[in-house]
Curated annotation (Swiss-Prot):
Designated name of the protein: Eukaryotic translation initiation factor 3 subunit G-1
Function: RNA-binding component of the eukaryotic translation initiation factor 3 (eIF-3) complex, which is involved in protein synthesis of a specialized repertoire of mRNAs and, together with other initiation factors, stimulates binding of mRNA and methionyl-tRNAi to the 40S ribosome. The eIF-3 complex specifically targets and initiates translation of a subset of mRNAs involved in cell proliferation. This subunit can bind 18S rRNA.
Keywords of the record: Cytoplasm, Initiation factor, Protein biosynthesis, RNA-binding
CC per GO annotation: eukaryotic 43S preinitiation complex; eukaryotic 48S preinitiation complex; eukaryotic translation initiation factor 3 complex
CDD domains: eIF3G (cd12933), RRM_eIF3G_like (cd12408)
GO BP field: formation of cytoplasmic translation initiation complex
Molecular function via GO: RNA binding; translation initiation factor activity
Highest taxon, organism lineage: Eukaryota
Main location: cytoplasm
Protein's organism: Drosophila ananassae (Fruit fly)
Sequence similarity: Belongs to the eIF-3 subunit G family.
Amino acid sequence: MPGIETIKSSWADEVELDYGGLPPTTETVENGHKYVTEYKYNKDDKKTKVVRTYKISKQVVPKTVAKRRTWTKFGESKNDKPGPNSQTTMVSEEIIMQFLNSKEDEKANDPLLDPTKNIAKCRICNGEHWSVNCPYKGTAMDTNMMEKKATAAAAAAVDAPKSGKYVPPFLKDSVGKVGMGMRGRDDTAAIRISNLSESMTEADLEELVKKIGPQSKMYLARDKNTGLCKGFAYVHFKQRKDAAAAIEILNGHGYDHLILSVEWSKPQNN
């Protein structure tokens, strides 16, 4: 008598024979985990079994959240258990909210902190870069710009309103020579130029300031051992307005890959 052949079938075929369709979703809770088993059709129109595992944890939530979870469900979820139902509930996207205080809000609206805006401005061509990186540095455009600044600064010094304060005679242009003779030298029209390169020479210093106004004396500080420039120099102009123009033009001016710092020379106390 021939043996009976055993016909093996897949679980999907068995489910189809037993239920004639998709079986209901089942949930089981074991050892702090919840297992949700559901059935659905894939893209090839075949039944598939999907098992999702959730870890159950307890957390402290605000009273409003706890109260909202006690609301009675309605519609297709009327008979659902507490919690979301994957058949009727779908999370589209997660929205993260960030609350800023007043200081952070002001900082966010500060135009100086905007990385898209360039705060650098060239003194030569008014471009959005530093003067030391200007492609027109040392050209005729740079020379014309320095001459215009010198003229404007000199005119501003002449037209400056008088404050009404007492001015000593040795500070006035009319008797400046008398004051210089009494003190040995006149520092009222002297400026100090710092942040110079080591390769600076007297010829370079004269070339830097000669277009601003006539000078009476120049001093370039050098190291006694190496003979290199110490990084600063003094220039005495014949007129105080020329010294003021030099400060206006050269302070912050890029020279030899360095930014110059120019200020009034402090008088020595003898």
